[in-house]
Structures are given as C-alpha cells and as structure tokens.
Amino acid sequence: MSDTPNYITPAGWRSLKDELYQLVNKERPEIVQIVNWAASNGDRSENGDYLYGKRRMREIDRRIRFLTKRLEAAQVVDPETREATDQIFFGATVTLLRRNGSEQTVKIVGIDEIDTAQNKISWISPLARCLIKAREGDEVSLNTPEGREDIEILEVAYVRID
C-alpha cells in the first residue's frame, strides 16, 4: 500500500464492508464446498471443478486481503458533517462549467469509490486535484491531452454521497 491516505465516504466504507462480508460469509464457503466435493472425485490433475475452484478460491482470498487492508487504512470522512463552506475539499459535490459550455457535476470521493457513470471522481484524479482548495466562482486550469482547459466553479455543496 502507498503512503497516500485512504479517505473514503461512509457509503464507500459500507460498500467495501458489504463486499468483504459477501466474500467471507457466502462466496468463499461455497467455493470451499465445491473444491472439497471435486477433490473427493479422485484424480485432481484433470478435474475441471477442482482446478477452477482452487483458482477462484485464490482470487477470493486475494480480494479479501486487499479489502481488509483498505478498510484498516480507511479514514472515513463524512461530507455531511463539514461546516458550510464554498471551498472544495474531499467529499464535495461540485458543479462546473466546462470549456464547451456544458455544466457537469462531480463528486470528489475516495480511490475505492470511483464511478464515472455517477460522476464520482477520485480525490487524487487530475480534475479533483486542480479543484481542491478552489472556491465557488473561481476559475481553475486543467491540463488535458487536448491542451489546457479553463473550468469555472459554479457551485460547491457538501451533501450525502451514496
């Protein structure tokens, strides 16, 4: 793991906990049962159920270790408890005016919560990094592959992020 803090919203933390619970209490026991059944069928070298089951169990164990480490390092930050401010920090929901004239709303969340379909961007992404500490009404510059883009910040809110 890196030295970068693992900031996460309460919803993101619950999501990781739910996934860990699912893996530990449902998926892994099912795979163990399949592997035990397949092992009892004799020759394991050509036993597809056994080989697949062992591979899947390793994948699950790897994911369990990853989730456990991420949750242990997590620093839960609730955007709803932040005092009203027009300055952008982790957990902010920001409405922007892009160069092409379109408005876009993004939510600045933790690394484990990224979801572009819901406009959730990581707090260490290039866009979020140029927004952090800026205020409503400010204009920030984002370096993109197409060149520099000036972005106007229209609104900053700290609301619940699901």
Where are these regions (language model features)?
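Internal alpha/beta loop-helix hairpins
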Residues: G48-R82, D86
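Non-DNA-binding regulatory cores of transcription-related proteins
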Residues: V77-A157
